[in-house]
Amino acid sequence: MNDVSKASLPKAIFLMGPTASGKTALAIELRKVLPVELISVDSALIYRGMDIGTAKPNADELKAAPHRLLDIRDPSQAYSAADFRRDALEQMAEITAAGRIPLLVGGTMLYFKALLEGLSPLPSADPEVRSRIEQQAAELGWEALHQQLQEIDPVAAARIHPNDPQRLSRALEVFFISGKTLTELTQTSGDALPYQVHQFAIAPASRELLHQRIELRFHQMLASGFEAEVRALFARGDLHTDLPSIRCVGYRQMWSYIEGEISYDEMVYRGVCATRQLAKRQMTWLRGWEGVRWLDSENPDRARKEVLQVVGAIAD
């Protein structure tokens, strides 16, 4: 697409960054001075009843700056990158039709990638998912997994022999990663985002600062009632650690503590470590991201001014 045709597209803003980098605070400030509406890009904030451990914006923040795509799933439900892309495009179209600019804020980089580039027909292999499938096969046999595929994707099951573990495993893996069947995905192709996107990433200047912020925020969550929040989820009886919601950083570690598998101190240590690892993965994504402008989270006023310099002209 050439620059002229790109300039005629509706505008959108991405505000990305690692966990605990101050994205939400900056987005709320930007909404005060720009004609923007916020869309959450976070695979944990979609879940109802998971507020403290996800650092979900509080009632006052949401009153000042409503976020779309919050609290749209029960923790027992799955939500894929394909689901997000569909929902986000719908919200962006609504916002644009109202004469405003979508501001997408969050740290789930896979969602940003899916939205920006479209979904590639098949997701990349996931060693963790593949390992779970192989473990299931060792316990139940490949014939049982073929029957499972028969229920999920009968078209693929008819094509794949029960004695072909590689193809059988891949078909199941694709479904578990994307929430879509192999048959569905091979019938579709990705479409690039039909918007002129201004992309920003906010992060502290050093890894040490980010680690300090992560540790501080984890302790703030604990002081705010995080344990009680997870105990309420645990008490439901229908949730478990195979669900994406309970595998969220912090929740998985608190769950292990509640089940008596680890001590409280070990839970805190593992929770902080897991959050740091998440931030590291997010930063790896962002360092390889094309066309992103970096903002310093330790200087929020300057970060706001830098966004306004770039975006202010498009808001006139």
From Swiss-Prot:
The chain's coiled-coil residues are: none
Name the coenzymes or cofactors required: Mg(2+)
Q: Which UniProt keywords apply?
A: ATP-binding, Magnesium, Nucleotide-binding, Transferase, tRNA processing
Q: What class of enzyme is it?
A: transferase
- Which residues does the record give as substrate binding sites? 19-24
> Member of which family?
Belongs to the IPP transferase family.
Outline what the protein does: Catalyzes the transfer of a dimethylallyl group onto the adenine at position 37 in tRNAs that read codons beginning with uridine, leading to the formation of N6-(dimethylallyl)adenosine (i(6)A).
- Partners and quaternary state? Monomer.
User: Which named protein is this?
Assistant: tRNA dimethylallyltransferase
